[in-house]
Design a protein with these regions (language model features):
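Predominantly a core beta-strand signature of beta-propeller blades
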Residues: 18-21, 63-66, 107-111, 167-168
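A beta-strand-loop signature enriched in Asp, Gly, Thr, and Trp
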Residues: 96-146
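A short loop-to-beta-strand structural motif that recurs across blades of beta-propeller domains
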Residues: 3-5, 53-56, 96-98, 157-159
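Short loop/turn segments that connect beta-strands within beta-propeller blades
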Residues: 9-13, 58-62, 101-105, 162-166
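Beta-rich, blade/repeat-based domains predominating
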Residues: 1, 20, 25-45, 49-54, ...
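Short, conserved, GDST-rich strand-edge loop motifs in beta-rich repeat architectures
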Residues: 1, 45-52, 132-153
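Oxyanion-binding "anion nests"
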Residues: 79-82, 86-99
């Protein structure tokens, strides 16, 4: 089954322990990739599909809902602003960081080109968004590296992006 597994971590002992709390089974046909917590007890997750995948939101008592305006080519990493108003998606297929509003109508979608296939997205201590990924001679070269260990010409990259202006460093 495809699911998000939830654990409670207790770091207080000599060794940290993790206790399974429960799980949320994915909607049929959805292959979850990256997950980010939302304020409260909800979360968002990417469905990495090419040419069209999307973001899904889960809330207790409501279940899963496709995030409006989130369809893109290969959504990979995801992060949410601390207030939950903005979602940041690693656009693997578009080689861009995508910012999408949450809870607004109409949905606001903007992106910043980074020039590589984004795999992971996280906030840095200074509040900027770090987008990490890879670039190679072709998009398939990344999959060839993962599957067969043929990694010639493949490079890892990280971009720092301002979460408000979407200016890329």
């Amino acid at each position: 089954r495809e699911s998000v597994e939830v654990f409670e971590v207790d770091p207080r002992g000599e060794r940290p322990t993790a206790s399974w709390v429960g799980c949320v089974v994915a909607p049929a046909g959805v292959g979850l990739n990256s997950v980010a917590a939302l304020p409260g007890d909800g979360f968002v997750a990417t469905n990495f599909q090419r040419p069209e995948g999307e973001l899904w939101e889960w809330q207790p008592g409501e279940g899963w809902e496709r995030v409006p305006g989130s369809i893109t080519n290969g959504p990979n990493g995801v992060e949410a602003s601390s207030d939950g108003a903005w979602l940041y998606i690693g656009g693997w297929g578009t080689q861009s960081l995508i910012r999408i509003s949450r809870g607004r109508s109409p949905v606001e979608v903007e992106s910043a080109d980074v020039g590589f296939h984004i795999d992971n997205v996280r906030f840095a201590p200074d509040g900027s968004v770090l987008a990490a990924g890879h670039v190679g001679p072709t998009a398939d070269s990344i999959f060839r590296c993962l599957r067969q260990g043929e990694c010639d010409g493949l490079q890892s990259r990280v971009a720092r992006v301002d979460p408000e202006s979407l200016v890329v460093d």
